[in-house]
From Swiss-Prot:
InterPro entries tied to this protein: YabA
Location in the cell: Cytoplasm, Nucleoid
Reported cofactor(s): Zn(2+)
Domain of life of the source: Bacteria
Cofactor remark: Binds 1 zinc ion per subunit.
UniProt key word DNA-binding: no
Protein's name in the database: Replication initiation control protein YabA
NCBIfam families registered for this protein in UniProt: PRK13169.1-1
Residues holding Zn(2+): H81, C83, C97, C100
GO cellular component, one term: nucleoid
Family membership noted in the UniProt record: Belongs to the YabA family.
Length: 107
């Protein structure tokens, strides 16, 4: 192999290295963009999970409150007082009690 062929081989090898280096830099930028996007999506996912948990907690509180009110309505409909003054006593002739009604009509 003479000197010219040797220099041509080195020149070709050098050009291949430059192309490879450019490809690596492009891949590096792409990976960096993906990492940034992944970080943003992770943060958004965390916030959404927190919000979902908060909504589930609020829904559970509303449900348990409604179930308690429904239970009191059932007791009242069976003919018993649910007010603080006469709780558990039977209502005479299923008469309305303004104290019990006030409890049931609260929001």
């Amino acid at each position: 192999m003479n000197k010219k062929e040797l220099f041509d081989a080195f020149d070709g090898f050098s050009q291949n290295l430059m192309v490879t280096l450019a490809d690596i830099e492009a891949m590096k930028k792409q990976v960096q963009g993906l990492v940034e996007e992944n970080t943003i999506l992770r943060l958004e996912n965390t916030k959404l999970r927190e919000r979902l948990s908060q909504l589930e907690h609020e829904n559970l509180a509303k449900t348990s409150s409604k179930q308690g009110k429904d239970h009191l309505e059932g007791i009242y409909d069976e003919g018993f007082h649910i007010c603080n003054f006469f709780y558990g006593q039977r209502r005479e002739n299923d008469e309305e009690c303004m104290f019990c009604r006030e409890l049931l009509d609260r929001k």
